[in-house]
Amino acid sequence: MKLAVVVQRYGAEINGGAELHARYVAEHLARHHEVEVVTTCARDYVTWRNEWPAGEDTINGVRERRFPVRRERDPHDFGRRSQVVFEQPHSVADELAWLESEGPTSPALVRYVASRDAGFDFAFFFSARYYHAWHGARAM
């Protein structure tokens, strides 16, 4: 079975909650299945700046594929949209705009996960609050 573990950041030195959980899941599943981690080139969860090169690598025996983030987070825009979504009546369109503003926004990552060429039988998305999880799950 070919599995995708899709997470906003990935690496041996990334110790965030969802990111570390995703790494543990990927490493465990890779003992029994073909696993590919699909992630962004971002290292910093505040800026989402592209710091790693796009492309493929192997970390702890797990194949990883990185995609660029389209743009860094604008903290003022994100703060304004967060205030609307968390403190005011709002629409689904407002929530989707917040999701885009929060980042990391990587349409190429979403296209890849959903493509027939990738050939995934199943995908695990970490975490639901991010662009790649919402759009990736809907695209599959």
Where do the protein language model's features map onto the residues?
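Glycosyltransferases and closely related glycan-assembly transferases
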Residues: 1, 107-124, 131-140
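A conserved catalytic-core segment of Leloir-type glycosyltransferases
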Residues: 40-117
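Short, well-ordered beta-to-alpha junction loops that form the rim of enzyme active sites
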Residues: 41, 126-129
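Active-site-adjacent beta-strand anchor residues
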Residues: 15, 125-126
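N-terminal subdomain of nucleotide-sugar transferases
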Residues: 1-68
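Short glycine-rich, flexible loops that bind phosphorylated cofactors or substrates
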Residues: 12-13, 73, 131-132
